[in-house]
C-alpha cells in the first residue's frame, strides 16, 4: 500500500468497509490497517500494510482480484465513480456465464470484482490467484489445507478454467478462486500482494500436514516476537504464501 490515508478512505467510502483496527510498529517501520464488513473473529478482512517511505509496489501478473458481493453492481459502480474511483469493467454478465459483475481498482492498482448477489454474511467473498497447474493446486489445497473443491468451470472459448476452493458454501464464506489460463505455467508475483491468513487450532500439526503434502514451510511454527501469537507460514506449489494463526492466540490479540 502506498498512500496510507487515501487508500483507507477508498475502502471505507467506496467499498463500505469499516476500519476495524490499526497498529503502528515504528521499530519495524510499518503500519497495518485491518478493514472489513464485520469483526475479525468472524469475518474475512483485508490487512493493508504501509512500509515507511515506500510509495509504490509492483502487483505483478499472478494476483487476480478480491471479490465483493453487493446487492446492486450498477449502483455500487455509480457510487465509486462519484467518489473518484477507477472502473475498469462496466457492469454486465461474466464471460461464459450469467452473473452480473464489474471490476474496479483501488488507489494502489489492486483489482476488485463486484459480484451481484443477495444478502450474505461474508461480503468480502473471494481472493483470485492464478496458477500454472490447476489439478496440482486443487490437490494441494484439499490435502494440505483441508479445503474442498466447491465447483469448477472450464471456459474453452476464453481459454481459462477456474476452481473455487473453501471451507463452506460460496454464498456464506470467503473462497479462494484459482485460475488456470491455458498454456501459462508461471506468473510474476511482484512485491505487493503478501499472503492469505487462515486460523487453525494447532500451528504445529498444520505445518506437519503441509510438509507431508508438498508445501514449503517458510516460517517454522512458533510464537511471534513481541505479541506471542503462534503462527506458521508456507508457500503452495505456485509460490503463493499462506500464514496459519493459532485460534486462541489470535482472539487474545484482538482483546488487547
Where would I find each of the regions flagged by the language model?
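A short, polar/charged loop-to-alpha-helix boundary motif
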Residues: 118-126, 249-256
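Vicinal oxygen chelate
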Residues: 2-6, 40-43, 50-108, 132-135, ...
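Core segments of cupin and vicinal oxygen chelate
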Residues: 1-43, 95, 128-173
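Active-site acidic/histidine proton-transfer and metal-coordination neighborhood
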Residues: 108, 113, 117
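Extracellular structured ligand-interaction cores
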Residues: 32, 63, 124-126, 162, ...
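Short hydrophobic/aromatic beta-strand element in the GNAT-like acyltransferase core
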Residues: 32, 101-103, 111, 150, ...
Amino acid at each position: 500500500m502506498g498512500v496510507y490515508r487515501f487508500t483507507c478512505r477508498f475502502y471505507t467510502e467506496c467499498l463500505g468497509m469499516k476500519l476495524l483496527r490499526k497498529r503502528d510498529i515504528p521499530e519495524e517501520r510499518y503500519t497495518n490497517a485491518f478493514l472489513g464488513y464485520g469483526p475479525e473473529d468472524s469475518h474475512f478482512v483485508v490487512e493493508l500494510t504501509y512500509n515507511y517511505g515506500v510509495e509504490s509496489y509492483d502487483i505483478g501478473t499472478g494476483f487476480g482480484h478480491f471479490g465483493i458481493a453487493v446487492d446492486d453492481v450498477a449502483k455500487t459502480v455509480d457510487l465509486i465513480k462519484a467518489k473518484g474511483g477507477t472502473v475498469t469493467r462496466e457492469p454486465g454478465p461474466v464471460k461464459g456465464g450469467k452473473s452480473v459483475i464489474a471490476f474496479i481498482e483501488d488507489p494502489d492498482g489492486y483489482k476488485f470484482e463486484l459480484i451481484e448477489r443477495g444478502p450474505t454474511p461474508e461480503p468480502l467473498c473471494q481472493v483470485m490467484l492464478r496458477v500454472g497447474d490447476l489439478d496440482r493446486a486443487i490437490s494441494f489445497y484439499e490435502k494440505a489445507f483441508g479445503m474442498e473443491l466447491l465447483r469448477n468451470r472450464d471456459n474453452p472459448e476464453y481459454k481459462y478454467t477456474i476452481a473455487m476452493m473453501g471451507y463452506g458454501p460460496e454464498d456464506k464464506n470467503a473462497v479462494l478462486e484459482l485460475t488456470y489460463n491455458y498454456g501459462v505455467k508461471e506468473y510474476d508475483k511482484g512485491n505487493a500482494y503478501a499472503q492469505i491468513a487462515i486460523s487453525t487450532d494447532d500451528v504445529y500439526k498444520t505445518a506437519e500436514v503441509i510438509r507431508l503434502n508438498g508445501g514449503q514451510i517458510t516460517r517454522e511454527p512458533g510464537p511471534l516476537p513481541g505479541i506471542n501469537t503462534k503462527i506458521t507460514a508456507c508457500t503452495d506449489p505456485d509460490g503463493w504464501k499462506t500464514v496459519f494463526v493459532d485460534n486462541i492466540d489470535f482472539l487474545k490479540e484482538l482483546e488487547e
